[in-house]
Amino acid sequence: MSKGKRVRITNDSLNSYGTRVLTAGMNVEQYQRNPVLLYMHERGNVIGYVKDLKVENGEVTGELMFDEASELSIRCKKQYEFGSLKMVSAGLDILETSEDPELLVQGQTSPTVTKSKLFEVSLVDIGANDDAIVLQKDGKKITLGKDSECP
């Protein structure tokens, strides 16, 4: 098993579904007990786990650890290291939403998710949150979000 790269799993930014998921309202306790890493949100396609999950500064981050126990996991690890797969997506149970105008941002077309529960994280080809992408490699910060520059 190789050392993972820290990734942003989610933050408060607007996603492709026209909504936002507030990190402050996200419960990660159960997920921390079973930090499963899936491929494309498919149960049964476990490819590893998420190590060192952190909730701070309005975002959830962690390190992806590939178990290399299946051909799929080996392939995903290689593609992740190469950079052809670099996005993750949070599997969430939505517990509460709000249409409060103070919680809406420009371009938002759906209510804000104010309470949720993280139950899985997936390596995906195209994620809903443009900011859910690799944050650092070899100790150097990499910013590839929609409004950021790539060093």
Task: Show where each model-derived region lies.
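Signature of dsDNA virion morphogenesis modules
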Residues: 1-147
